[in-house]
Each structure stands twice: as structure tokens, then as C-alpha cells.
Amino acid sequence: MKLIEPQAIRLLSSTVPENDAPAWSAGTAYQIGDSVIHEHKVYKAVADSTGKQPDQHSEGTDAFWRLMGPTNRYAMLDQYVSTQTVAPMGAETLTFTVTFNRCTAFALLNFKATSIRAVVKDGDGLVMYDRTVNTLKDVDGYWKYYFLPLERIVDQAVTNIPMSPVATLEVTLTQEGGPALGQVIAGQAWPIGTTQYNTRLGIRDYSRKDTDEFGNTRLVKRANAKRTSLLLYLHPSRLDSVREILARMHGLPALWLGDDNEGIGSYQSLTVWGWLEDWSATVIGPNEVSMNIDVQGLK
């Protein structure tokens, strides 16, 4: 198992325009229903206003604006996997470049693409990593190939990039009908331990289920988020360093790779973007520590 501790990254370029709405202007009079962009987020007016900066007047009973979410261009850089940056209509590729300073790993989550190319360059333009991945999953047998829909991976993590003080990551996603990407993460990868059998995984469902007095149930489908309980083995010599890493991650989102095999056949269900809920370690003997890590995913 590995953990990717994310670092702040900056979008340098993108083929996706930021044209969801006009930019907010302090001198413009806005009416109810108007939409604006402010600091890469879309706001909708809930009251007439002039000079009311959206991020400062979007909460409480006297709010003038309601936050609707990130712009399409920056949806892949918010904290949520479910909000996707989608290529412009008619485009079959989505290309962007972000800073990759002092990073050793990156991950692309909740994407829709038939192929992905990632290129990492240092500050002098030297290519340190260049790989193209076909997202088609392995097919187990001819019957599945001919009679079942082909499946594709939706998450991909790479944790073996050489570190450079100044670097960039350029990604190109290709998909007929338009690619999309839910989250891009860059940071440092830390080995935690070896994932054992009896690891548990599931989801937290945010859908509503209301049943009235007559037994009629109304279901409202909403988002869900991954959750996992990882059982790990590690050597006692690594316990202190792992404890420091986990202590640093409390209350912060990170990418947890329960299966750090970066091939197509890895268990993607054990890849969770979320926060550390709890962990405990048991020193079984002089050469073995058993550790439980509970992670709750972000939707």
C-alpha cells in the first residue's frame, strides 16, 4: 500500500475554456438568476446586488449569491471526484499542463478516455516520464469479448517519477465523443505497508430513502463515496515513520492506494481519494506489526 500526499498544483494551460458565465464585476448590477465566475467558481444570484463579491456574500440568510460549483475548466482541481472537467463539444482530446514541483507521483481519477498520455518534464524541458496507456481492461475469455460490453479503467496512479525542484505534468486524454476527468492529483508517494487479505471495502450512499406510514418508499438517487478498511503488515522498523505520515494526514484528503500495482490488472476498488478516519497498530512480535487503516472517500 502507498499513500500519495497531495501538493498544491497550478493549472498552466488547458484546452478547456473558462466560459461558463461572465466574470464578476464590482460595477455591474446583477439581478436574481444571473450567473458569474469568480476565482474559478460559478455563482448564481439569489438577490439583486451591485458590488457584492460572491465569495464574501454566499452564506447566511442575507446571502446575495449561491455557490454552484467549480467552472468546467477547474472541476478537475477541486476536492471532489464526481465533478468532472469535460472537453468542449466536438473535441475528442483534452490536454492540460499543471505544475509538478517536488512531486514523485500523480493520479487521474474518474476519467472517461480510451487512451491517456502523460509527460513529465523538468525545469530544463528534459523528459523524465512519457507513457501512453490504453484504458481497456483485460478480457477474460472469448465469450466475454464477444458478448459483454468492454470495460475500461477509470482511475490511474503513477508513483515512480523522479523528483525535480521544478517540473510540469502534461496530460492528454482521448475519447470519441469527448473525454472527461474528475480529479488530478500530484504529490509525494509514501510506502505504508503490505496489504493483506481480509481487507474490506464498500461505499457510503448519500441517496434518500423515505418510507411513509403505509410502507410506500420513495428513493432519491444521490452520490456515493468509496470507503475501505485496510489490513496491513509492516516491519517494526518502519512503525515510527509510518505513524508520523499518518499523523500528518489527519483531517486532510489524500490518495490511498490499497493496491499499488500500477498495471491494468490492479484492484482499483482499493484506490480511494478521501480522509483518514482511524488507524491502529498492533506489534505482534519482533518482526511483525499488524495495522488497520480506515479511509472514507470523498464523493
What is the role of each PLM region?
Residues 1-85:
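Tryptophan-rich substrate-binding surfaces of secreted polymer-degrading and adhesive proteins
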